[in-house]
Amino acid sequence: RDLVRSRGLGDVYKRQERKLAQQETFEMVQEQVQAARAPLSDIVIPSPGNSGKLNGGTLHLVILLISAGREYGVAGIFQWETLPIFRATDAFGLSRDTTTSVIPQSASGCYSYTYNISYTNEKLQYVTESREDVYDVPYNELKQDGSGYGYAMEFGLPVSSISSQPHGTSTHYLSATGFVFFEGKVNNSSTTSVNHFATYAHKRIAYFFNGIDFSLPFGMGFSIDMGDWSYAQLREEHLWTL
């Protein structure tokens, strides 16, 4: 019985550690979003958050909205706590309802990978380092639907590599994080609530050479050209009550 209790406490501690790591990541992104919205950084309103197991990996989603009156900045954030088995081209997007307008060309995105790299240095020592690669996605590289209600980015999930040589270079990818951000405003003074939606589409099989159609509105998801069962999706909704 004591052993069972000990294992149970151990599981609780592990979950708490994962939650703390997730919170630190979200706080880091929140700081970046707030920096972009410095003049309007009055109130930060997070969504409840959503998590799921996709293709052997653990994915977290959350939406952060920073408001000042009826103007705001909003970021949809994803985090792969553990990466999925199959890694190809994924997509992540953020959309809004029709009660709001986007500040022209304010949208942007960013994603990053953390990994360990092992190699032989100039002193002929075999070392392992922790690194992070960060990629910015400017406005003109984002995808958007025909009505401009949503913005999304496509990116590849990295594959780890192990050297066949005893002291060759090996790379082990650990996690991935990213966000899509834009600035907006509420159109009508009579509006009392606003919805935003974040959607992650993970390609889990390479059988179809299919892709995602971003030309159609994706209020609650993307349009998959064909073989949509080859994609796994996770969504999050943010309700802002004014």
What are these regions (language model features)?
Residues 64-68, 79-83, 97-99, 162, ...:
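Generic structural motif
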Residues 2-13:
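Single conserved hydrophobic/aromatic residue that forms the stacking wall/gate
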Residues 40, 131-134, 211:
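Intrinsically disordered, low-complexity regulatory regions of eukaryotic regulatory proteins
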Residues 22, 36-39, 153, 157, ...:
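Intrinsic disorder/low-complexity segments
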Residues 228-242:
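Short, low-complexity, Pro/Ser/Thr/Gly-rich segments in the mature regions of secreted, periplasmic
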Residues 14-119:
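Short N-terminal edge-element motif at the start of the domain
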Residues 94-195:
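Short helix-loop boundary/capping segments
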Residues 149-151, 155, 159, 194, ...:
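Glycine- and small hydrophobic-rich membrane-insertion segments that are intrinsically disordered
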